[in-house]
Design a protein with these regions (language model features):
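Often metal-dependent polyanion-binding catalytic scaffolds in large enzymes
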Residues: 1-437, 444, 499
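Conserved small/polar residues in nucleotide/adenosyl-binding loops
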Residues: 582-588
């Protein structure tokens, strides 16, 4: 399947870089080979003919363009339903391949411009470098110490691709990267091409859409592929590059100065506003899926790091604290410890990290005898290993791969991402009316209370930061925030729960009234207590889509800027620093 043609206004307007053009050409040719193998020359000829006519329909000569469009319509009308389906799938696969090539070309271009002494524009490392250059190292370090970067995973409402399709596309991108490796010999290059044809054939033969609409847990599992393949590995690289930028581009072998400032959030499995399929049971299962993925990733990473610490006790003796950790391990699990010691004789740091990996696996399996009670307990063990290595003069081992693992534990914990709950204020008002009236509660009210109980259960297992944000959609009064605290008291019979109730202002009227509403929110005792705990930090959400529907996109944008300006002044007046704004920039059409 060819990739370019002449005579097109679009081709002239969007000229591909040569390396991208070569990738697209190779992928198009490979797809053509797959189509020929599947349906013979006739299928490929139909696809090519439609492609040529479609390109010609954009010709600068309007008569040529109109004739080509008419011929294309006639061609499609002549096909059977099965042939039309095959051609449509061929073009779908082709566009997937072009997108994969474009994404990889962007990565290739970014890598080409990435230098240790000159970080890429738009990155955290570049921001750190700029601040250090303009305001000094100490100022940059101070800003990093207070930084929290919090990307939130959401389910894309228009994402219809199956995970199998996404996986195949990702494998094809990896093969494009492998093909660029200059170390490949002729046989390895041929094998890469064979694997590319195999993956394109898989993509062609895989049904592009699910038979059933994906449920919330399907969406959670889809998001986990991004964590498994990208986020878990990229986050420590972000820290490492920020560390280098803070050091002026120089390599360091000292204790890192960059804290773990990334904390993931997720609305998938927690956002129930308008979605009856997101129940308390779904929220519980969503967290279980998240935890399983992060624990598997940590176990694998810990095992890899441990296997690399083949430093014997003669050259790198264990410090006092690490000897205590090892003694505790031997007393708690003598058989496991003996097995590890036999495989790693006289290698105390290796034994300690591999023992930690075994405990992570036990935590995932819910093996109470061996599991960790918290991510903090794992961090304590890893830091004991790190301190021992540093004390023995093995700074490269202390602050190398082991530091990357520590950053991962600090960033993801045992829960991966904070699961945020969102519900409409009207649902809370209706639930409180039922509770105050007495009598039998409706299923919807019981579900509201059950959700809060699940939040408490998640906090009990993974810590308060695993599920503490409760977003109130369409916040219109102070009572809408107070309602969540009152519902929590009913749900838990007064037992404590850590809650950050986040007001979400969405309409033009609510944006205009937000400062007055927040004046009342500040008076709530639960909010006062939380401000004292956090150094007077507060999160506020400003909605975009519904305000745009309410007053129009231009007026909504102005209202958002005005609201943020007034909220900043309000926060300064009440010594709330910093105030965090989250903008929901959802589609308006």
């Amino acid at each position: 399947m060819a990739s370019t043609a002449t005579g097109s206004r679009e081709a002239a307007r969007f000229e591909m870089p040569e390396r991208l053009r070569a990738d697209v050409r190779q992928l198009g040719d490979a797809l053509g080979q797959v189509l020929r193998e599947y349906g013979g020359d006739a299928l490929l000829a139909d696809v090519e003919r439609l492609r040529e006519l479609t390109i010609a329909s954009h010709h600068e000569d309007q008569t040529v363009a109109d004739d080509a469009a008419a011929l294309a319509e006639q061609l499609v009308a002549s096909w059977s339903l099965d042939r039309a389906d095959e051609v449509a799938r061929a073009f779908t696969v082709y566009f997937h391949l072009v997108n994969a090539a474009e994404e990889y070309h962007r990565v290739r271009s970014l890598r080409a411009g990435d230098r240790a002494d000159h970080p890429l524009a738009g990155t955290v490392a570049k921001a750190v470098e700029d601040v250090a250059r303009l305001a000094g190292h100490d100022k940059a370090k101070h800003l990093l110490d207070g930084l929290e970067f919090r990307p939130v995973l959401t389910a894309h409402p228009t994402e219809a691709r199956r995970r199998a399709i996404v996986t195949s596309i990702r494998r094809i991108a990896h093969l494009l990267e492998r093909r660029d490796d200059p170390r490949l010999g002729a046989s390895e290059d041929a094998e890469t091409h064979r694997m590319l044809l195999e993956q394109i054939d898989v993509l062609w033969r895989t049904a592009p859409l699910r038979v059933d609409r994906p449920g919330p847990l399907d969406e959670v599992r889809t998001a986990m592929s991004a964590f498994d393949d990208v986020l878990f590995h990229v986050v420590p690289q972000v820290y490492r590059r920020a560390e280098m930028a803070l050091a002026g581009g120089a390599e360091t072998v000292a204790a890192p100065q960059v804290p773990a400032f990334v904390r993931l959030g997720s609305w998938i499995g927690g956002d129930r506003d308008g979605n009856p399929h997101v129940t308390s049971a779904v929220t519980r299962q969503a967290m279980a899926i998240q935890s399983d993925h992060v624990l598997r990733a940590l176990e694998s990473a810990c095992t890899r790091v441990g296997r690399g610490l083949t430093l014997d006790a003669g050259s790198t003796p264990a410090a006092t604290e690490l000897r205590r950790v090892l003694a505790d391990a031997q007393a708690a699990q003598p058989e496991l410890y003996a097995e590890l010691a036999a495989r790693s004789p006289n290698e105390p740091h290796r034994i300690a990290v591999l023992y930690a990996a075994a405990r992570i696996g036990a935590t995932r399996r819910r093996d109470a005898d061996l599991s960790y009670t918290s991510a903090a307990e794992l961090l304590a063990d890893l830091r004991a290993v790190q301190a021992s290595l540093a004390e023995a003069g093995a700074a490269r081992q202390a602050y190398g791969e082991l530091q990357g693992l520590i950053w991962q534990v600090e960033s993801f914990g045992f829960h991966l991402a904070e699961l945020e709950v969102r519900q409409h204020s009207a649902v809370h008002r209706a639930a409180l009316e039922e509770i105050r009236a007495g009598g039998v509660l409706s299923d919807r009210t019981e579900e509201v209370l059950a959700t809060i109980r699940v939040m408490a259960q998640i906090q009990a297992r993974f810590g308060a930061d695993a599920c503490r944000r409760y977003v109130v959609s369409f916040t219109q009064s102070t009572d809408d925030v107070a309602a969540v605290f009152e519902l929590a008291r009913h749900a838990l019979d007064g037992r404590p729960i850590a809650l950050d109730v986040v007001p979400l202002f969405e309409t033009g009227a609510d944006l205009a009234a937000c400062v007055g509403i927040l004046d009342g929110v500040l008076e709530l005792p639960e909010v006062q207590a939380r401000l004292a705990e956090t150094g007077r930090r507060m999160e506020i959400m400003l909605g975009y889509s519904d305000s745009a529907k309410d007053v129009g996109p231009v007026s909504a944008t102005l209202a958002l800027y005005d609201a943020q300006d007034r909220l900043t002044a309000w926060a300064r007046e009440h010594e709330i620093t910093p105030v965090s704004y989250t903008h929901l920039t959802l589609p308006t059409t």
